[in-house]
Amino acid sequence: MEPTMGGEMESGGGAATGECVNRIPVPRPPSIEEFTIVKPISRGAFGKVYLGQKGNRLYAVKVVKKADMINKNMTHQVQAERDALALSKSPFIVHLYYSLQSANNVYLVMEYLIGGDVKSLLHIYGYFDEEMAVKYISEVALALDYLHRHGIIHRDLKPDNMLISNEGHIKLTDFGLSKVTLNRDIDINMMDILTTPSMAKPRQDYSRTPGQVLSLISSLGFHTPVAEGNHDTANVLSTQVSETSPLSQGLTCPMSVDQKDTTPYSSKLLKSCPEMVASHPRMPVKCLTSHLLQSRKRLATSSTSSPSHTFISSMESECHSSPRWEKDCQESDDAAGSTMMSWNTVEKPLCTKSVDAMETKSFNERDLELALSPIHNSSVVPATGNSYVNLAKKCSSGEVSWEARELDVNNINMTADTSQYCFHESNQRAVDSGGMTEEHLGKRSCKRIFELVDSSPRQGIIPNKKSCFEYECSNEMRDCYATQRTGFAFEVQDLKLLVYRDQQNDCVNKENVGSSFTDKHQTPEKSPVPMIEKNLMCELDDDCDKNSKKDYLSSSFLCSDGDRTPKSIHMDSDSSFPGISIMESPLGGQSLDPDKNIKESSLEESNIEDLLPVSPSCQESTLPKGVECPTIQDSNQKMLAPSSEVLKPLTSKRNAVAFRSFNSHINASNSSEPSKMSITSLDMMDVSCAYSGSYPTAITPTQRERSDMPYQQTPNQVKSETPYRTPKSVRRGAAPVDDGRILGTPDYLAPELLLARAHGPAVDWWALGVCLFEFLTGIPPFNDETPQQVFQNILKRDIPWPEGEEKLSDNAQSAVDILLTIDDTKRAGMKELKHHPLFSGVDWENLQHQKMPFIPQPDDETDTSYFEARNNAQHLTVSGFSL
């Protein structure tokens, strides 16, 4: 007879007395396989959302592809989104239940809000009346106040990310661009989740099961996906070996790892291969680690920005790839006989393939690397290595009947696809595009993406950046502007802000320049303005009164004021930032249309390399001690006036705005050699119309060794763990925020983000002001045909206030004004809103209990029709599943 719970406890306690002991199975960690797919809901810029079911409860499951996040250099943002949702326990923020992952995807399991998003509701209503808008803005303001008090900045606030609950209340979601500040360098822990600061007496609504807590504190493993069943190899090859996963001693199989006290299946999941040892006793694991560790150091394939993410998460099963939730992109693996492993099949013996069949093949080092490489493309692996690859991948051979139920989302058509909003060079692969052209397969990128990897990572050092002639960055990129809308969040690739300059301010001093970089096809008078290479986006202010300092500079870029048109140059080669644009235009005859009067040119790599060697005398005299460097003023303050006053302070100086292209990578150098050049201080750069300075002073580490490059040291350089970041000694002003990229939806970006200034919670209040205007009028205040024009409208604060019968009330217009204040230090926040006349009738203490103007009336609990309006507006056709 089955013992009762009390009997179990008694038998457990009486083990010493000889009573019968009942074995209690150890609970398994939560898995995505426990959820059933119902239907897709919607799609965003960085992931897809599906309706999932576990038991009798429905969940919204956000699926993010690891490969996409690695390619976009946004792995830290997925971690930030998980942390922000896990830390938040507010009635106005979506609740996160699980954070799961597989070899290829990350799954955020959240509560499903059946009312859809506010953007869809706004499309149906057209615009909201003032009372309705005030209620929605009030609840969002409380959510923002909660986040800011807990060190979280949303940074992507917009109606699309406001969901409507069953009772009609607002909840914020999509923290993919958020910033989480914990005032420490470690990830969130269990205490952060169980006892958040605002919950002195936690409510039952926010309680979590042990499995949920375990999933939320697990480390997200953003290594590149490996062969199924070969996850242990990544641990073995890691620079640090976990105590729970020590490297097996002696002559063992490369896959053998002795894990103790893990899951009940660990003894069956991790086995040594005696056949392998017997057949090849001279190839122990130690023979492989040195080479593969060197490859990892060069290619950074199995680590993220945080050292704590080096290991594969304990929540990720060793041979678990969730076939029901993801589609295997390597179809050739099935042809080779490899199968994916799930919890259903973990009890099957490992290494079922006989090793005797391989004894006739040469077990050389390259084949082992192919078998143990973190990622590979089995379709292009040489035949000599296929058997070893299959050995490492073939963990089991059974029960794949349910694998046919794969998620099919290839019918999600987007005429306004996210890739269209990425302003990319024409030859660079768009992240969301369907595939790679043949010509691109031969060009190796610094990011190890599946389509491009066709050999061992231990081959020659991969070139970090393409040469400049591989980019066609003029007409094609500008042509895509005309058809773009600005509703999607995306990464701004080539942000071009036209900055006015004085027509009479001519700083070109051609005679004092020792040597100049001029294209062989151009005269010195028409030399292109170079990009300013800096590790963070910055706005550089010219000082044209210090021409005498150019005598000490070895080379310069020349431009003439005779050329009055805006200039944009995309220079790659060994430059730090491919795709950075500098645009200058005269005060007179200025047009805001980026398609007009733009001259673009590029410096060919061959010409640059010919000019790179610098004599010792030049490098020593780059900047003498006694010379005071030109100051780089924060000209952002000059942009703080309304549109009628913006141009006035800019007429005395000429400004150049340099912005990073988002196809360039942060810390993207794959080279393991020490830096050939440290990024020199901006003190040594004369940022004038003749951008002077020795060219190598702004070069980041490259893949190619150049013995003729001189070393230049930055004064008082601070040693850093990451040698490829800008040293702190050369940074001016406020500490840089994150990686300096501009992320978000153009219409809702705050001016400080566009101007690359340090930003804080004020960016969310700016976005709230944009949302308030949009609720009252139906369109965002800075909306325009192209993102470029939107950015100009934001910087000018060009707001088209409704007139006549559509005129907003004085209180509403005043509320928008105080939120849309250019100066972030004077921008309104929660305190100002509570005392504003527009919100005088709001009961801030009982907002979650107030009656809302719109309450969803779905057909059933799986109804997703409230999301359709937004999907249709963005031309998203969400298909079902092909089972």
UniProtKB/Swiss-Prot annotation:
Residues 301-314 have a biased composition (Low complexity). It is found in: Cytoplasm, Cytoskeleton, Microtubule organizing center, Centrosome; Nucleus. PROSITE patterns: AGC_KINASE_CTER, PROTEIN_KINASE_DOM, PROTEIN_KINASE_ST. GO terms for biological process: cell division; DNA damage response; G2/M transition of mitotic cell cycle; intracellular signal transduction; mitotic cell cycle. Residues 710-720 have a biased composition (Polar residues). It comes from the Eukaryota. Serine/threonine kinase that plays a key role in M phase by acting as a regulator of mitosis entry and maintenance. Acts by promoting the inactivation of protein phosphatase 2A (PP2A) during M phase: does not directly inhibit PP2A but acts by mediating phosphorylation and subsequent activation of ARPP19 and ENSA at 'Ser-62' and 'Ser-67', respectively. ARPP19 and ENSA are phosphatase inhibitors that specifically inhibit the PPP2R2D (PR55-delta) subunit of PP2A. Inactivation of PP2A during M phase is essential to keep cyclin-B1-CDK1 activity high. The modification Phosphoserine is found at S295, S373, S456, S556, S560, S635, S661, S672, S729, S879, S882. The modification N-acetylmethionine is found at M1. Residues 35-839 form the Protein kinase domain. Belongs to the protein kinase superfamily. AGC Ser/Thr protein kinase family. The keyword Acetylation applies. The active site is at D156 (proton acceptor). Residues 840-883 form the AGC-kinase C-terminal domain. Signal peptide: none annotated. InterPro entries: AGC-kinase_C (IPR000961), Kinase-like_dom_sf (IPR011009), Prot_kinase_dom (IPR000719), Ser/Thr_kinase_AS (IPR008271), Ser_Thr_kinase_AGC (IPR050236). Its EC number is 2.7.11.1. GO terms for cellular component: centrosome; cleavage furrow; cytoplasm; nucleus. It catalyses: L-seryl-[protein] + ATP = O-phospho-L-seryl-[protein] + ADP + H(+); L-threonyl-[protein] + ATP = O-phospho-L-threonyl-[protein] + ADP + H(+). One of its GO terms (molecular function) is ATP binding. Phosphorylation at Thr-745 by CDK1 during M phase activates its kinase activity. Maximum phosphorylation occurs in prometaphase. Residues 1-23, 298-317, 511-530, 569-597, 706-737 are annotated as: Disordered. This is Serine/threonine-protein kinase greatwall.
